C-alpha cells in the first residue's frame, strides 16, 4: 500500500488541505483572510472524512513553511508538529514560493518560473525556480526580500524568458518586461506540496522537527 500524506497550506490569504492516498490527491481550499485558526482544523477533519482516512493511518504530514504571514504559518506548523509527535510520523516542510512554482507547472506546464509575493510597502519576496528533467525545482537559494525596482532590474538581466506568478495582481506590473512571457495571479495550494513530499520520500529526505525550518515574512494579523 502506498503512503498516505496530509499537507497543509495557510501561508497567505487562503487555507487548503490535501490528502494523498492510493496515488490520488484529494484537496479542499477556502479563502480565509485573518480566519485561518477557525478554518484549518475543520478542513483537515473534512478531508479525512471524505477520503475515509483516520489520523492513525497517516504516514507523513507536510506544510508550507513560508514566506508568508507569521500567524498563519505558525498555525499550520503547530498542527503539523503536533501530528508528527503524536503519530510518530515524519514532518516535511516546503517553501511557499516553490509550491507556487509547482502549481504553475501543474496548471500551465511552465518550467521557468519567477514567483513574487507581496510583503509590505515597496518590498516583494521573490525567487526564480527552474524545474529540471528529474522533476526537481531548483531555486530556493534565490529566495529574497527585495525592493520592487531591484527585482525589475534582476528580471531584465535574465538570459531567457520566464513565467511570472504572484499572489497579487499589482505585482504583474513586471509583465511588460521583455523577459516575462506569461503571467498569472493565484494563491498556493496544499495539493502542490504533495509532489515535493513524494520526491523527499523517494530520496529518504525526511525530518521529525521543524526547528530552523520556517520562513516568516512578516506579521500581518
Swiss-Prot record:
Pfam families: TsaD. It is found in: Cytoplasm. It comes from the Bacteria. One of its GO terms (cellular component) is cytosol. GO terms for biological process: tRNA threonylcarbamoyladenosine modification. Keywords: Cytoplasm, tRNA processing. Belongs to the KAE1 / TsaD family. TsaB subfamily. Required for the formation of a threonylcarbamoyl group on adenosine at position 37 (t(6)A37) in tRNAs that read codons beginning with adenine. Is involved in the transfer of the threonylcarbamoyl moiety of threonylcarbamoyl-AMP (TC-AMP) to the N6 group of A37, together with TsaD and TsaE; this reaction does not require ATP in vitro. TsaB seems to play an indirect role in the t(6)A biosynthesis pathway, possibly in regulating the core enzymatic function of TsaD. This is tRNA threonylcarbamoyladenosine biosynthesis protein TsaB. It comes from Buchnera aphidicola subsp. Acyrthosiphon pisum (strain APS). The gene is tsaB.
